[in-house]
């Protein structure tokens, strides 16, 4: 039990702080005697429900109902109540900090100890309950391989064996064909479906001009060769003898001008004929390819 002087000191300290109900409730718990019941504490000094803050209403209701959790901290707090009360009264009255009392004051405040929640034996913390449900994404993702169902070993075994043999043979034939094709040259079959007449005309004109020069070179070579052999002189003498016997004018039948003049005339005619014939041939080929198809051509690599 407390003396009247201590109760007056408590009231003066409550007036100085402005929150007397909170500290009064804490001091009332600290100065309680172990043999005194909770009903006696409520009759002697019971705070009003409106004076206490919300976070201490639960502790006040628990003290009124008579429920005391079995916490070892509460027993140690009740064993040494008097020194804490004296230190608090001195601190509130004088306005100075209380001296450090080693071994007398507990490490935690009584008011804060009363507010600490006590976990039941079957209660699991919030983080532990949800940590087990979360998947572990720190390691590599394991991919499950679908298992193939084993075939039934019964009447279907010979059929399955035959199917496997045919599949193996088919794959072997395909591999042999691919290997043969890979070793041999690559071939491609195509059809020439259309030829442009204008392009054909240009190509034929170029080729005919080239052939004209080839023709003229060939004529000059033959003329020189036959002249060296004396063919043209022999021919001219024979022709002159025939004309003299008949009473005609004798002259040279074969000369340079006559030979090269005739060669140029023949070459020009060949150019015109070859160019026109190539253009006409391209036009006819396009018509025939539309009717019966074009010429098939096989393209292949070098052996």
From Swiss-Prot:
Q: Does the keyword Transmembrane helix apply?
A: yes
Q: What domain of life does the native source organism fall in?
A: Bacteria
Major subcellular location class: membrane
Provide this UniProt record's keywords sorted from A to Z. Cell membrane, Membrane, Transmembrane, Transmembrane helix
Q: Where in the cell is it found?
A: Cell membrane
Extent of Polar residues compositional bias: 61-89
So where does this one cross the membrane? 205-225, 264-284
Q: Which GO terms describe its cellular component?
A: plasma membrane
> Where is the region Disordered?
1-89, 132-159
Question: Which membrane topology describes this protein?
Answer: Multi-pass membrane protein
Q: Which family does it belong to?
A: To M.tuberculosis Rv0007.
Protein name (record): Uncharacterized protein ML0007
């Amino acid at each position: 039990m407390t003396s009247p002087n201590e109760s007056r000191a408590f009231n003066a300290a409550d007036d100085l702080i402005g929150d007397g109900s909170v500290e009064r409730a804490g001091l009332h718990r600290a100065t309680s005697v172990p043999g005194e019941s909770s009903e006696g504490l409520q009759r002697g000094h019971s705070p009003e429900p409106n004076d206490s803050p919300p976070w201490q209403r639960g502790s006040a209701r628990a003290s009124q109902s008579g429920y005391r959790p079995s916490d070892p901290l509460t027993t140690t707090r009740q064993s040494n109540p008097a020194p804490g009360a004296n230190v608090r009264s001195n601190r509130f009255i004088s306005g100075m900090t209380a001296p450090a009392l080693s071994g007398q004051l507990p490490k935690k405040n009584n008011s804060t100890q009363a507010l600490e929640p006590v976990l039941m034996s079957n209660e699991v913390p919030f983080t532990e309950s949800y940590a087990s449900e979360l998947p572990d994404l720190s390691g590599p993702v394991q991919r499950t391989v679908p298992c193939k169902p084993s075939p039934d070993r019964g009447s279907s075994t010979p059929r399955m064996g035959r199917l496997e043999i045919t599949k193996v043979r088919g794959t072997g034939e395909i591999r042999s064909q691919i290997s043969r094709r890979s070793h041999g040259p690559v071939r491609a079959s195509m059809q020439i479906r259309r030829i442009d007449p204008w392009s054909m005309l240009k190509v034929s004109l170029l080729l005919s001009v080239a052939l004209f020069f080839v023709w003229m070179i060939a004529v000059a070579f033959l003329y020189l060769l036959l002249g060296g052999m004396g063919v043209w002189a022999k021919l001219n003498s024979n022709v002159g003898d025939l004309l003299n016997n008949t009473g005609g004018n004798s002259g040279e039948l074969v000369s340079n001008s006559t030979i090269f003049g005739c060669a140029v005339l023949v070459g020009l005619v060949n150019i015109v004929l070859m160019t026109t014939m190539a253009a006409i041939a391209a036009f006819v080929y396009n018509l025939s390819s539309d009717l019966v198809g074009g010429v098939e051509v096989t393209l292949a690599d070098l052996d």
